[in-house]
């Protein structure tokens, strides 16, 4: 679980911890990345709670979080652009809890991705019921990976660029390319 930079991810961390505290039968181990910008007193409070949970660990920051994501069985995140792209590119089941303030960017992205079947989404602005999060965590590793969802062209950007360039280069020029302009007097 990643709270991004941590400056506004405390609600997500609290909700995930509340789910593990309520439902001790969640079998999936959790590594919570608090983020370097989370307030120290909040970090300490979360770490005390984590000390009481057998299958939850935490770190403040990892400069190579992509390695953690690569080895994860699923990712819980707020749904910022970078993390969203990592969920897709590393082909991980994702549970996104987007923020809606100060912008709707994460919310729009997460809702559309859920509609397409790429990940699941919980709305974090409503009442954060620990049971709802526990259920979502239990279901996380059962949901399809993004690559199992057939959406033609979703991650074909490089292939499409190659095709467009090849098509352009294959076209014959109707006007010859002049390297030297003739000067007439």
Label every PLM stretch briefly.
Residues 42, 63-67, 82-83, 132, ...:
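Short acidic active-site motifs
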Residues 1-74, 126:
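Donor-nucleotide binding loops and adjacent catalytic segments primarily
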């Amino acid at each position: 679980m990643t709270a991004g930079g941590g400056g506004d991810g405390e609600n997500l961390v609290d909700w995930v911890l509340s789910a593990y505290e309520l439902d001790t039968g969640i079998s999936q181990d959790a590594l919570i990345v608090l983020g370097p910008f989370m307030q120290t007193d909040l970090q300490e409070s979360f770490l005390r709670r984590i000390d009481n949970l057998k299958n939850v660990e935490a770190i403040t920051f990892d400069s190579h979080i992509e390695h953690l994501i690569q080895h994860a069985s699923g990712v819980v995140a707020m749904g910022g652009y970078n993390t969203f792209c990592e969920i897709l590119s590393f082909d991980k089941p994702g549970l996104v809890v987007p923020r809606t303030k100060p912008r709707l960017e994460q919310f729009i992205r997460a809702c559309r991705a859920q509609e397409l079947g790429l990940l699941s989404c919980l709305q974090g602005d409503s009442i954060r019921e620990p049971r709802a999060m526990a259920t979502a965590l239990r279901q996380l590793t059962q949901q399809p990976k993004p690559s199992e969802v057939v959406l033609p062209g979703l991650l074909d950007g490089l292939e499409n660029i190659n095709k467009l360039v090849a098509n352009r280069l294959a076209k014959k020029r109707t006007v010859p390319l002049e390297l030297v302009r003739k000067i007439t007097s």
